[in-house]
């Protein structure tokens, strides 16, 4: 079944791995299913050349460096050290950037996504739930294949998005909000579940698309959203289709 998503021409993708991230295998599997030629690269050995050869760069989920300072902070410093300029060149040159969960936290700290922070959930504890989402950014290259409402697994302790006063509303008006929660469990400002930059080529989201690749990954065995694929697959496939 997984081979059914493969295109005739592979597109290169770089998946950055940090100490403590734990979704690398699932994310690689989803990317390959969508058609990408995927390379998992530890951040300690990643080079600007790895980025330059890739059309999509993904920062995956987990607990980079154990989240010992704040989520994504140490990973951000290491990413800036090894790849900061390369990632900005990649983005400016038309490449795609995707941050999932911890990767979203890292992208906000790198300044690639609109200024914001992801802090402790409203309930001040780790929660693993399914999140119902609304697609806000209709022009996002990552969301074209998804319906207006869908759901994905979510698992984090620091996923409450906060901004400077009034900024969340500005992001919503400016088209920077990619996804919103239907049930805003984390207490995010404007119910924001995902942000994108002004071009749409960089996006971050807290829920995990790689964890809903196939219909059998859904909690309801009778889920009838799609016969062959879970909603997460279509996020990666949308990115694949968007690349020339």
Indicate residue ranges for each PLM-predicted region.
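Alpha-helix C-terminal capping/helix-to-coil transition sites in glycosyltransferase folds
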Residues: 5, 52-53, 93
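A structural preference for short, hydrophobic beta-strand core positions in alpha/beta folds
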Residues: 40-41
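Amide-donor transfer/coupling interface in amidating biosynthetic enzymes
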Residues: 44-47, 53, 86-89, 118-244
């Amino acid at each position: 079944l997984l081979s059914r998503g493969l295109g005739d021409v592979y597109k290169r993708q770089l998946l950055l791995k940090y100490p403590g991230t734990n979704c690398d295998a699932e994310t690689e599997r989803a990317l390959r299913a969508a058609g990408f030629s995927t390379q998992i690269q530890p951040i300690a050995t990643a080079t600007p050349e790895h980025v330059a050869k890739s059309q999509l760069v993904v920062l995956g989920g987990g607990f980079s460096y154990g989240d010992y300072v704040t989520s994504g902070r140490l990973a951000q410093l290491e990413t800036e050290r090894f790849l900061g300029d390369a990632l900005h060149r990649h983005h400016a040159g038309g490449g795609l950037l995707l941050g999932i969960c911890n990767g979203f936290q890292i992208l906000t700290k790198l300044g690639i996504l609109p200024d914001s922070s992801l802090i402790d959930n409203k309930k001040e504890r780790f929660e693993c739930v399914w999140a119902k989402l609304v697609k806000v950014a209709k022009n996002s290259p990552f969301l074209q294949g998804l319906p207006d409402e869908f759901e994905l697994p979510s698992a984090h302790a620091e996923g409450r998005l906060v901004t400077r006063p009034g900024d969340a509303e500005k992001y919503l008006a400016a088209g920077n909000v990619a996804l919103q929660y239907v049930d805003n469990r984390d207490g995010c400002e404007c119910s924001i579940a995902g942000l994108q930059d002004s071009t749409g080529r960089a996006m971050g989201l807290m829920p995990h698309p790689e964890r809903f690749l196939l219909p059998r990954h859904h909690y309801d065995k009778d889920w009838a959203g799609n016969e062959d694929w879970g909603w997460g697959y279509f996020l990666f496939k949308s990115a694949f289709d968007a690349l020339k």
